[in-house]
Every structure is written in structure tokens, then in C-alpha cells.
Amino acid sequence: MRAVVCTRYGPPEVLRVEEIPTPAPRKNEMRIRISATAVTSSDCYLRGLRLSPAYRIMARLAIGWNAPRQPVLGMVLSGEVDSVGPDAKSFDVGERVFGFNRHLFGTYAQYVCWPEDGLLSPRPANLTDEESAAIPYGGLLALHFLRRADVRAGHRVLVFGASGAVGTSAVQLARHLGAEVTGVCSTANVGLVTSLGATRVVDYTVEDFVDRAERYDLVFDAVGKNKSAGPLRRRREVLAPGGACVSVDDGTPNLRREDLVLLGELAARGEIRPVIDRTYALDDIVEAHRYVDMGHKRGNVVITVA
């Protein structure tokens, strides 16, 4: 099968498309023929080990010291169950699915074997594979952190980085939970964030959200503290009494299959929609990583595989 292989950490150019053996599912696995995947910011951080020194050591211990132990990166997919092991009962051959393979990687390829208890769900019938692949990463992370902050109807939520993969999901999911949402983004993305349901949008190139009169029950950093420490340094100044600040890189999120199912149901009903900035072919994976590395993508960057 064709796959993107990463044999050392470094810039996008370390990625190569190669022919490698097609995996066979073990007893408790399913093999999925992948139609689409996505390049997430996490993929790029891991490929380049662009992390703080402490996190870099932890990442090397977890995924490989000099190179990823699993040379095929990629965390999300949409595709079709191609083969099942004898003990895998959750999905049938031919079933269309989408999912998030966070710790095992392997989705930059034509096929991947997926554990029976992995984060996999039936694909929304009204969405394309490209749209479905754009849901799991931002959707699951945003849902985890909004729940962690106990966002409820009537809460006022500020989403910093509202136009990225996590941010676009956070705006929509916070609105679904009944919150009043303020999004922070650049001029070019004001229209997008407004269309996703934000009540107010702050253009950070024009004004500082800290200078506004509003106070919030939650300030959600959907970018990550390493990248947004400067703009968010004064974020506690805008908190309402009892309010909280959370960041997408605050600890290890608890990602659950039932939440992926929920995201699929919300997308099927049109209550949330995946946002796709650009779509690349698998052969253009280096260019896709270069684009994500720039840090200005709107929503998701999707890769077509099949």
C-alpha cells in the first residue's frame, strides 16, 4: 500500500510517500481502507518535535527517541471497513466509518488496522469522506474542554483562536450547549467565525479583547499556551466571578467513542459543520504540512487518500 513515512524528526521534507506492506488485522482489529485523513497541528508538532524542552523529552519517550516508532503518522480518518478479525464485532465489512487514532497514528496511508475499542463511529451519511475526516480532531478536543469547564446554557464563552480546527468546533459546540460565544480571530476570518454562530467576534489585529467591557464564564485558548502566551497573558482580567481559563494543551484529554458518535449525530442534523480550508492529495503531503506549519489555516486541512 502507499503511505507517508517519517523516519526522522524534522521539517515537512522528512515525509516521503512509499510503498509499504498492507497490514492484516489481528483478532480484535478491523482494517479500514482510508478515503481521507487530515493534517492536524499535533501531527506537525510531533513531526518536527516543536515542543518545549520538557514536552520534547516526554514525546521522545512516548513515540520514539530519534524517530517515530510508528513511521506512518496521522490521527484521523474517514473510510470503509475492509476486513475484520474474528473477535472484532463492532463494525461490519463495507461499513463507512470515521475516527481518531490518537496514540497509534497510521492514517497517512491507504489502510490502517484499528482496535476494536478504538475511537471509531459510523460516518454521517450526508457528509463526504473529506468532511467526516475534518470532524474528530477539533470536535473531540473542543467537546472535552468545554465539558471540563462545565459550560451550560447562559454562560458567556470566549474562544481564542476561533478559526482553527479546535476553535471552529468550540464555537459551534458552545452554541449547541446554549452558551453565548465571543470568538477571537484575525480580520480575514471574522466572517467565518460569525457564520459558525458567534454572537460577537473580536478582530485581534484591531483590538485587544481584554480592553472590552465583557466578562466571561470561560476563556478557552483553542491555540495552545506555547503559541498564544503573549495575547492571553491578561486573560484572567476578563473572567466573571467563578470563571475559568482552559487551554487546549492543559493535560491529556479524555476522548470517548460516545462523544465521537455524538459529533456525527450533530453533523448529520446540521447542528455543527466541518470547516475545510484546503484539500491536498496524499502525494502533496509535504506541501500540506508546510501550509499547516504557517499557523494560519481556517479549520482543517484534509488529505484525500483513495
Language-model-detected regions and their locations in the chain:
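Glycine-rich beta-strand-centered segment in the early N-terminal region that forms part
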Residues: 21-38, 52-103
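Short glycine/proline-centered loop/turn elements that form peptide/ligand docking sites
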Residues: 85-87, 181-192, 209, 226-227
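Mid-domain Rossmann-like dinucleotide-binding core that forms the NAD(H)/NADP(H) cofactor-binding site
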Residues: 93, 132-203
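N-terminal Rossmann-like NAD(P) cofactor-binding module of classical short-chain dehydrogenase/reductase
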Residues: 98, 219-220
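A structural motif shared across PLP-dependent enzymes of the aminotransferase-like
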Residues: 103-116
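A short acidic, Gly/Pro-enriched loop at the edge of an enzyme's catalytic core
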Residues: 211-219
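Glycine-rich phosphate-binding loop and adjacent beta-alpha segment
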Residues: 221-275, 282, 305-306
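C-terminal capping/lid region of NAD(P)-dependent oxidoreductase domains
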Residues: 271-275, 289-306
